[in-house]
Regions:
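Phosphate/diphosphate ligand-binding glycine-rich loop within oxidoreductases
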Residues: 7, 35, 40, 55-135, ...
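Rossmann-like dinucleotide/phosphate-binding beta-alpha-beta segment
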Residues: 144-198
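Short loop/helix-cap segments at secondary-structure boundaries that form the rim of catalytic
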Residues: 16-22, 71, 89-96, 186-194
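Short gly/ser/thr-rich secondary-structure transition/capping motifs
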Residues: 29-41, 60-61, 136-144, 193-198
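Phosphate-coordination loops involved in phosphoryl transfer and adenosine-cofactor binding
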Residues: 3, 76, 152-155
């Protein structure tokens, strides 16, 4: 028999649900789309009646965990935010009710850096416009007008050298780009370590 019940109130990966369910002493219920009424901007009555049964809550962005939710959640011990920000969780109310709030700050770091780098590469090589011309059958126009530029040897400015900016800079350096960084919190020693110019 499970000692702790966890409610997953927003869609998350099936693998995440399976990992929770596999943990000893935990039962997991997935009930998405019931937590928040976008018209009223408040938690639904259904959610407020349901939440007292649970010890844990897993959310993404849809569920708004307000002071009203915490007041109803008599057994809640922990909230896991499957994502970076916790702006949809009233952290002051969480503290008042002794509920731990956790997030996954590095969950999308690599994906975001890769996506941004892919967009830069596609822009430099004119992938979008060239593809559109090829679909129209204009092969010669695509070849001449959309040759693009090489990233090799170019200077790249990165604004913000947090987790994502750092990963983005690493990808640029692998293309032999010279990275110039702006970040008021980045020390010269850390910039040297990352091989970026301040």
């Amino acid at each position: 028999m499970a000692n702790y019940r966890v409610l997953v109130s927003d869609p998350i990966s099936e693998k995440g649900v399976e990992a929770l369910a596999a943990a000893p002493g935990i039962s997991v219920d997935v009930k998405t789309g019931i937590s928040f009424d976008a018209k009223t901007g408040k938690p639904t009555e259904e959610f407020l009646k349901l939440i007292p049964e649970y010890h844990g809550l897993v959310v993404r962005s849809e569920t708004k965990v307000t002071a009203e939710v915490f007041a109803a959640a008599k057994n809640l011990k922990i909230i896991g935010r499957a994502g970076v920000g916790v702006d949809n969780i009233d952290r002051s109310a969480a503290t008042d009710h002794g509920v731990i709030v956790m997030n996954t700050p590095t969950g999308n770091t690599i994906s975001t850096a890769e996506h941004a780098f892919t967009l830069m590469l596609a822009t430099a090589r004119n992938i979008g416009p060239a593809h559109a011309e090829v679909l129209k059958g204009n092969f010669k126009a695509a070849r001449k007008a959309y040759q693009g530029i090489e990233l090799n040897g170019k200077r790249l400015a990165v604004i913000g050298m947090g987790r994502i900016g750092t990963e983005f800079a690493k990808r640029a350096q692998s293309f032999n780009m010279h990275v110039v960084a702006y970040d008021p919190f980045l020390s010269q020693a850390r910039a040297d370590q990352l091989k970026v110019e301040l």
